[in-house]
Amino acid sequence: MYKTFIARTKSIFLIALAVAGASIFMTNKNVTVASAESTAANPLLDKWEGPYGGIPPFDKVKVSDFKPALEEAMDQNLGEILLISANKAAPTFENTITEMERAGRTLARLRTIYGIWGGNMSSPEFQVVEREMAPKFSAMSDKITQNEALFKRIETVYNSPEKAKLTPEQQRLTWLQYTNFVRAGARLNPEQKARLSEINQELAKNFTKFSQNLLSEENDKFLVLAFEADLAGLSQSLRDSAATAATTKKVTNAVGIISNTRSSVDPFLTYSERRDLREKVWKMFVNRGDNGDAKDNNATISQILQLRAERAKLLGFKTHAHWRLENTMAKTPERTMELMEGVWTPAVARVKEEVADMQALADKEKAGITIEPWDYRFYAEKVRKARYDLDQNEVKQYLQLDKIREGMFWVAGEVFGFAFSPVSGVPVYHPDVTVYEVKDKKTGKHVGLWYFDPYARDGKRSGAWMNAYR
């Protein structure tokens, strides 16, 4: 769906968009960031070149390049970390915390592209790489957080009286590094650390399996609309979308299909007059990963819960929730539930009122039904029409994609002083993607590039999100 650029603050927005500046940083002039041979052979390890301060080489990416590039970048990162931990000089913010921030730039840049392929361009070939690399990423992370010499340096900086002389930002960064290491098991004994690493790798495998199963369910399952009568209630645009989806999936002898994604399911549940088909579509969507087949996620979920519980106990927490919330504003599961119940209780009460309105309308029409989940959107639209004379189809002409995008640009211009203009010649990872240069509206100074990828497709996970390339 839409990859919006909305951010909480201007600084976050700038981080998301900024592409200027160096891509590779070295912690020591004697460290080779990448060998000439491997860099030449694998474009994923290359520094981002070209205009706008360097741009991702999406046009050169091959799935087969990911594994060797990632493994080399991981080795580089570990080498940088070892240099920091082996430093004979007394630990300071500059030679420890700052150097840790500089370490791993090559890997971070590479994982940006890797993440884009995982969320936007997944394929069976790429998923093989994901399954192999997930536990390796976890093992590498544990090697860093379980490095005793490195943790001692961080701890020394954290407990040093000199910390008071640091800026608030530096103190915050020091606190984050120290806290993250402690939460990752830096204080455990060797036996506990070994078990923790095993748990983390198993979790990484299960998270990957869960995500891939869910994506497969969305890509492979759909409802066939075999007859013209199956389109009852759908607007022409929705009929066209269903027909296009059928063509894409090479489904013949059908007037269309409803894909197992929210962008396809929600409009069908809202407008289809075929209650029997609405039920099938609703169940298809909510039962993703819960069909007792090869893509069923129930056993995976159970394994994740067991591993999380064991990890929490190992780290000294009552439950995974206690560990997860310990460094957040809510702090505890109990406080979190209080916050949730404060919203949940009135929300449920309001939903019951809405369902009562829907049921009254259905009874008035002598529909002879009891409102079920697959009726909710359909009857919500009918109630809205009856009560307010508001038809969403009449509003749609003002909500075309181009107009929504222009509205986003206008808001960014008013709030942040940004101006957007389309650019060509910038590599993209899919033909759907369009690129815009962002400038300061007053000075004309380059701020960054914005990549817009609005459409659902096979291999792209559902939902709405934003990636920061650099």
Each PLM stretch: what is its role?
Residues I24-E37:
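Signal peptide processing junction and immediate N-terminal pro/mature segment
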